[in-house]
């Protein structure tokens, strides 16, 4: 399988696009990321976003299928978690959401 717009596949790109580029989704994600990281830290884990966290958050915001048909089952959740951790780092560095 090839890449799509720099992401592992179209579904991964599409889910992150909806999280990053739709105002309501972006605000929801930015509100939740620090809370998820804190919950992980408080439970003795690293204060990061794990694959399961990324999947759960994206499913809450986007759903199991995007409006144009990308399926959650096709998403590389590790890649989404990595992107969310980058956003979380930027939020910490610059304060609040960026």
Give the ranges of each region predicted by the language model:
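Acidic interaction surfaces
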Residues: 1-98
